Amino acid sequence: MRILCLHGMGTNSKVLEMQTSALRHQLSHSQSHKYEYVDGGEPMPPAPGIEAFIGQDESLAYYHPHSAKSILTAIDDLWEYIAEEGPFDGVLGFSQGASLAAMIIARAHHSDPPPFQFAIFFCAGLPYCEKSLSAGEVKFLRAEATQGPVIHVPTAHIFGKKDPDVSYSKAMTELCHPWGRVLLDHGAGHEIPRVPVETVDDMARAVEKVVTKAVIGQ
């Protein structure tokens, strides 16, 4: 399956490849996927702890989180990329990448088929309300402001209780249809753990469950 991979703010695709290396290795034993990475187009200072791995000129984001114009441009650019380079079976997003993936799915929630058959969210940031963005207002999309779920494809929500922003990841789950949700708290922080092997196994099983739900539709 083709999986589009979207990195976090202040990193890049090479960092996401490194972050997911153990998980992808574990998944290769049971499932065959092709991972395709897209870099953000906005320069951004490196995320905490990333400075040792990438230079200032390599540190990117998809959008500036306080700019409605920047966020809308990121949605439009990725929408166009998917139309030109797709179809993709699934999407994997970390932090800001997960937020952007959710905004793409939310934009297309009446589309058949949807842009992705499943989504894998790591330490997800909340998506923004596109209607508010169009009015120049940066406002999170929250379940209490929507009439039911806006994401109807199977979703894996993998986060850590030590993440200072874990409340956003948990709020993201409420935007997704309950039948397709798979939740996993890996117990760590704002990261995709590569050790211990038991945690990697747990994450792989969560992804496998979501892919299976997408394939069999239940």
Swiss-Prot record:
The keyword Endoplasmic reticulum does not apply. Pathway: Secondary metabolite biosynthesis. It comes from Fusarium mangiferae (Mango malformation disease fungus). Pfam families: FSH1. Its EC number is 3.1.2.-. The active site is at 95 (charge relay system), 163 (charge relay system), 190 (charge relay system). Induction: Expression is induced in the presence of 6mM glutamine. The gene is FPY3. This is Esterase FPY3.
